[in-house]
């Protein structure tokens, strides 16, 4: 859970009741984050949501109805409780299920404000003082779960600003975009300037960013007064043009916000950036000053996340800038028109792994590798040295002496968990013991891979951090196994740790508690066994059943219970004292005096034995020694549980964050490069792709023999696929032909192959020679349907 980040105080008179406090908080946070905001207030051991119901049946005050539908909760009325004449409604859930419902609310775009009881500052036992603990939204929520199908959780901020140019007659538009992936801490910013036209083309670059990053939460900041009087209508159009359709969208006018005003001040920007990226970062990273609107957007986003959960932006990566000296330009929806990424059509979705080039060719085995390949395939480059290095490594891995490594890599990497996400969970203190177990097991897998590769000098030179992986792996494993009983952590998925997972010798106070608990628990178990043996021996009962049962509850601890009928028998047997001479007790029981025996070395004093009702059919066995013993065991259990929780929290911060974090980071880069390499190699081998050859030339060109469309050749299995030869020089070519002969398919195949080559992949050709391109422009009408095998003409005919 996040640290305390705010304590709200109303400007008006102090609300008298908890219901008024709740409604006051709700009103305040709705103003900040919009109508889709819900306050979760801790009351006792529950989180509760309140609302008001008028005499006419109207419900107001909060989003309690939506909350009940999303979380499948019942709404109840508080009897004899009202606020301003309105009946108070209530819904809620136990404290320990908070994580589950935060996930549900975040998934549908709600912002959840978690308010807890301030136990430390309550006066005279008053438990009704409350403080804001954390704020969660779709783009700022990170759970304890590691094994999620969702690879990224991106939050995006778009800053739209209009201005009048001295050299241009028409109004100009500039928009800066910032994206942060809270699963990895990586960020991206870019800026685009253009003459304003109210059409989709103006927002091509924005649409490309939205398509690539698929944000789950978007903040739209706008000042479009120089363009239109109806800014809200234009913002609605912009969302449509850019494909912004996530559940959580916040819209703010720049002129009406103090926060945006701060983000336009250079002193504030410099101070904020230096806080996260070190002193002089503004001067050394010239892109911050070159792209001021994008930087403003980034600063606003940092502040927004910090308000929600300050830990999320600890050790955040310096942003990647959209325009670099080696990245090719992708214009006019290139990625979608070439099916590099999904177009989200029904036919595309039904096609599964063939829905896009990315889905088909991304054969990475780890979430880390899958994210890295997505970044690669959406950012082609024209850096010839880097490209040739990638081709060389794939060729080397395809050789007979190395290809056997690929199956080994895929098997080992399949068991490697999302280490990047775990790094963020460590920073926000949301690491369950089961996550630590997965981290430990994953590092062992990486260690095994590294041992096998140490003799391969070329591969070691290619993989980043290869020289320190052995030390990093050993450090992480030794730190974890030196503190925790690793196997005991395997199935503990919550933050509440009740099992004994801390190793003996780590903490002397815990060891003393454990020793005392062991002695007390052994005595309790001894009493339990003794009473059962008395019944079995005296009545010749089978040995495979307990006639005196141990009943344990979290609140009351352990107790010994027996049926009412057998309780009378047991009392008589103990009073007659005939059991002590029976053969089964020989050598293990000594009678000290009436009502006192020495059983297996433990003194049991049951002289004051009594029975009290426990249930309708059972009674609880009590005597002074047993009552004190069960109370002591319960107290020790709570003490041990608290001590383990404290030690585990210290372990996460002092060991995982302070001592292991940098080592995990090095392993992440190593795994990412290894997984991407094996994926590229595996795809090339499985699909018979060839190595691109980069040729010298004054201008970009390509010459492909036997070029194929990487999706169509798998989607259309009912006909023989006919490959094509094509050569495009600086003058281009005119491609023409009759209907349904594959013109569009060939155009797409050329575009896909060239982009694959410039992403460091082998390509679906017999041979492919080219000079890398610095920009890609596509204009392919989306009237065909490659998933159904229909050309543009075929689609038109089928619609008749």
Name each region found by the language model:
Residues 44, 105, 218, 369, ...:
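Residue-level signature of catalytic and energy-coupling elements of molecular machines
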Residues 1-373, 378, 385-399, 403, ...:
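Basic, polar low-complexity surface loops/patches
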Residues 171-173, 287, 291, 569-576, ...:
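ATPase nucleotide-binding head domains, primarily ABC-like/P-loop NTPase cores
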Residues 505-556:
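N-terminal accessory targeting/assembly segments
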Residues 46-79, 217-219, 223-278, 355, ...:
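A conserved P-loop NTPase coupling/switch region
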Residues 219, 294-339, 349-350, 359-360, ...:
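Structured, non-catalytic alpha/beta "coupling" segments that mediate domain-domain communication
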